[in-house]
C-alpha cells in the first residue's frame, strides 16, 4: 500500500496585472513556488519587475532550483535575461512549442512577441523542451 505524506506548498505571485501599494504590476505573470524543500519559478513576466518584486519580498532568485515557462509570449518570458543574471544554476523547462516564433499581427505588420532568439541561443544548455506531460522531479 502506498504511503501518503503531507507536503506544504507556498505560492507567491511575483508579478501580474494588478498590484499592491509596495509591489510593481505589469501585463504578464511570474510565480514563485516552494515545494518539498525546493524552490521553483513559473514564468518571469514581461520585464525585470518580477525580480524587483522578489527582492522586495525577500526572495532570492539565486536560490531557485528549477524554472518553468508556460508558453513563449513575452509577457511570460520577458524577464529571463534578468533571471539568468541572478541565477547560474536553474534549468528551465518548457513545452516544445515554446521555442516557436510568436507574432502579433498589426495593421503595420507582424510584431515578434516570443522569447528573444539570442536568449535561447545564449542559454541553450539551460533550456529544456518537453514533448509530453512528465515529472521533472518527483511530484513536479
Which ranges hold each PLM region?
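Conserved beta-strand hairpin/beta-sheet module of binuclear metal-dependent hydrolase folds
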Residues: 9-56
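Metallo-beta-lactamase
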Residues: 99-140
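Short, glycine/charged-enriched secondary-structure capping and boundary segments
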Residues: 26-28, 56-57, 82-84, 107-109
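Active-site metal-binding motif and surrounding structural segment of the metallo-beta-lactamase
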Residues: 49-97
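Short, Lys/Arg-enriched N-terminal segments with co-localized hydrophobic residues
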Residues: 1-8
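Short, structured patches in soluble enzyme cores that scaffold and shape functional sites
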Residues: 15, 94-96, 131
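Active-site metal-binding loops of divalent metal-dependent hydrolases
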Residues: 16-18, 44-47, 72, 97-98, ...
Amino acid at each position: 500500500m502506498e504511503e501518503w505524506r503531507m507536503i506544504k506548498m507556498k505560492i507567491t505571485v511575483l508579478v501580474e496585472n494588478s498590484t499592491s501599494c509596495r509591489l510593481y504590476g505589469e501585463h504578464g505573470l511570474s510565480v514563485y513556488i516552494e515545494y518539498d524543500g525546493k524552490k521553483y519559478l513559473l514564468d518571469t513576466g514581461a520585464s525585470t519587475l518580477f525580480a524587483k518584486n522578489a527582492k522586495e519580498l525577500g526572495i532570492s532568485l539565486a536560490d531557485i532550483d528549477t524554472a518553468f515557462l508556460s508558453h513563449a509570449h513575452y509577457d511570460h518570458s520577458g524577464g529571463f535575461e534578468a533571471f539568468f543574471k541572478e541565477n547560474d544554476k536553474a534549468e528551465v523547462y518548457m513545452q516544445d512549442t515554446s521555442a516557436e516564433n510568436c507574432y502579433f499581427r498589426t495593421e503595420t505588420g507582424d510584431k515578434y512577441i516570443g522569447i528573444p532568439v539570442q536568449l535561447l541561443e545564449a542559454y541553450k544548455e539551460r533550456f529544456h523542451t518537453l514533448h509530453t506531460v512528465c515529472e521533472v522531479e518527483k511530484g513536479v
